[in-house]
A protein has these predicted regions:
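Glycan-processing catalytic domains of CAZymes
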Residues: 1-378, 385-416
Length: 416
C-alpha cells in the first residue's frame, strides 16, 4: 500500500517583512491562501521565528486543515549534538524531547521538526543517532532534513562520492529521504534541462527502496541566482518538474519557494511575493498540485512494476539506481512504442488491469510537439490528463497522443 502523497514547500509565511511584524489579519489571509494553493505541509519561514509565532502558525495551520513543521533552534541544537553528550542517556533524551515538545503537541497540526538542510556527510552520524532517539520520543512526527543533489561540490558534501553521501543518511530512522535537484536552467539565453536529473532520482529511489523509505523531491517554483535556475513562471515548467518526479516514484513533492525569501534580490517569482501577494508561480503550482492529487487518487491501488524513459529515441529502463538498456518485460499489454521527443514513463498493474503513466521530458519551453505512440491491444483507450478522463479510438491497438508542455497522461485499455 502506497503512503499518502505529500505536497509541501520551502520558505514559509514569515513573522516579519522588512523588519515590520506581520499582523494577525495578514497572517489569517496568508494561511488561507497557502491552503488554497494545494500545499498541505506548511513550511517554516526562512528567518528565525519567535516561539509565539511558531505557536500561532500551528493554530493557523489547524484552522486551514494543514500540517505545520516547526523549526526550533533549541531542539535543533540539542538533537544535532546529542551523540556528543554521553552524559545524556537515551532514556533521559527521550524524556527531554517529549517534555520540551509538549507545547507543540497540543496542536494536532504539529507535523514535527525541521532539523537541517543540505548537511554534509560529516553530520550524518549525529543525525542518524538523534533520529533513532527522536523516533522513540515522538513516533509519527517528522525528523525532517533535506539532502544535497549530486551536482553539489565535494567541498559541500565533504566526500567525493555522492553514493556514499546518500548511503550515510539512509541509515536515519525516518520514513523518507528528501533531496533537491533543480533541473531547469538558463545560460546565455538558452533554456535546458540540467544533466543528471534522471540519474539522481534513480539513485535516491534505489536507496529508498532498499531501506523501505519514501522518496521526497523538490521542484523549483522560485527562479534564483538571478534567473540561472528557472522556476515555475509557466505551467509547463511547473508540470515538467512535478510530474517527472512523480512518475519516477516521488511520494513527496516540495516547492522551492512558497514565500519569496527575504534574503537577497536573486529570488524571483515565488508563489507569493515578499509583500504577501500571489506571484506568477502561484496559479501554475496550484493547478499542478490539483492535477497531482487527482492522478494519485486515480491510480489508487495500482502498483508500479516498471519505470523507464525514451531518450533521443532510445528506450531506457530505470533499474539498479540508473538508466539501463535492459529490455522491458514481454508480458506488458500496455507499452510505449515511440516518442517524438524525450519522455519518462511508469507501468502500473492492479490485478489484471494495466496502464502506463507517460510524462513529457522535453524542455518545457521548447515549443516542440511530442506525439507518443502507445500499444494498448484494445479498440479504445482511456486517457487521464489534467485531472480529466477521455476515451480515444485506437487504430490497430495503438494510440497516438500529443503531449503538451510538461504534460502527463495515464493510458489504460478499454473496449477489448
Amino acid at each position: 500500500m502506497k503512503n499518502k502523497l505529500i505536497i509541501g514547500s520551502w520558505s514559509g509565511i514569515p513573522e516579519y517583512n522588512l523588519l515590520k511584524k506581520n499582523d494577525d489579519e495578514f497572517l489569517e489571509e496568508q494561511f488561507k491562501m497557502l491552503a488554497e494553493s494545494g500545499v498541505e505541509l506548511s513550511p517554516v519561514p526562512i528567518c528565525h521565528a519567535s516561539e509565539e509565532f511558531r505557536l500561532k502558525t500551528l493554530e493557523l495551520a489547524r484552522k486551514n486543515g494543514l500540517k505545520q513543521l516547526v523549526e526550533d533552534y533549541e531542539m535543533s541544537v540539542f538533537l544535532k549534538t546529542l551523540k556528543n553528550r554521553p552524559s545524556v542517556t537515551e532514556e533521559k533524551a527521550v524524556g527531554l524531547i517529549r517534555e520540551y515538545s509538549r507545547k507543540y503537541l497540543e496542536y494536532e497540526s504539529f507535523a514535527g521538526y525541521f532539523i537541517a538542510d543540505e548537511p554534509s556527510i560529516e553530520e550524518a552520524e549525529n543525525l542518524v543517532y538523534a533520529s533513532a532517539i527522536f523516533k522513540k520520543a515522538l513516533p509519527g512526527k517528522l525528523f525532517y532534513f533535506n539532502l544535497f543533489p549530486q551536482y553539489a561540490l565535494p567541498s559541500c558534501l565533504k566526500t567525493d562520492s555522492y553514493d556514499d553521501y546518500i548511503a550515510a543518511f539512509a541509515k536515519a530512522e525516518t520514513d523518507y529521504m528528501s533531496f533537491d535537484f533543480y533541473a531547469l536552467m538558463t545560460e546565455n539565453g538558452e533554456n535546458y534541462v540540467r544533466e543528471g536529473f534522471l540519474e539522481n532520482i534513480a539513485k535516491v529511489k534505489k536507496v529508498c527502496e532498499n531501506r523501505g523509505k519514501d522518496m521526497w523531491t523538490f521542484c523549483c517554483s522560485s527562479a534564483h541566482y538571478y534567473g540561472a535556475i528557472r522556476g515555475s513562471e509557466t505551467y509547463g515548467q511547473a508540470a515538467f518538474q512535478a510530474f517527472v518526479n512523480y512518475t519516477l516514484g516521488a511520494r513527496g513533492i516540495f516547492w522551492f519557494c512558497y514565500y519569496a525569501p527575504d534574503v537577497d534580490d536573486s529570488y524571483l517569482n515565488a508563489l507569493v511575493s515578499r509583500e504577501g501577494r500571489k506571484d506568477v508561480a502561484y496559479e501554475n503550482v496550484k493547478k499542478v498540485n490539483a492535477e497531482l492529487k487527482a492522478l494519485d487518487e486515480y491510480l489508487g491501488n495500482y502498483e508500479c512494476v516498471c519505470r523507464g524513459a525514451v531518450i533521443n529515441g532510445l528506450l531506457k529502463t530505470i533499474s539498479d539506481g540508473g538508466l539501463t538498456d535492459k529490455p522491458l518485460a514481454d508480458d506488458f499489454t500496455v507499452k510505449i512504442l515511440a516518442a517524438e521527443q524525450n519522455v519518462v514513463f511508469a507501468v502500473y498493474k492492479q490485478g489484471d488491469k494495466e496502464g502506463i503513466l507517460i510524462t513529457n521530458f522535453d524542455e518545457p519551453t521548447s515549443g516542440r510537439e511530442n506525439t507518443v505512440t502507445v500499444k494498448v491491444d484494445a479498440s479504445e483507450a482511456q486517457v487521464l490528463s489534467a485531472g480529466k478522463t477521455e476515451k480515444f479510438r485506437c487504430a490497430n491497438g495503438e494510440l497516438k497522443y500529443k503531449l503538451k508542455s510538461g504534460g502527463a497522461i495515464f493510458v489504460s485499455p478499454c473496449g477489448r
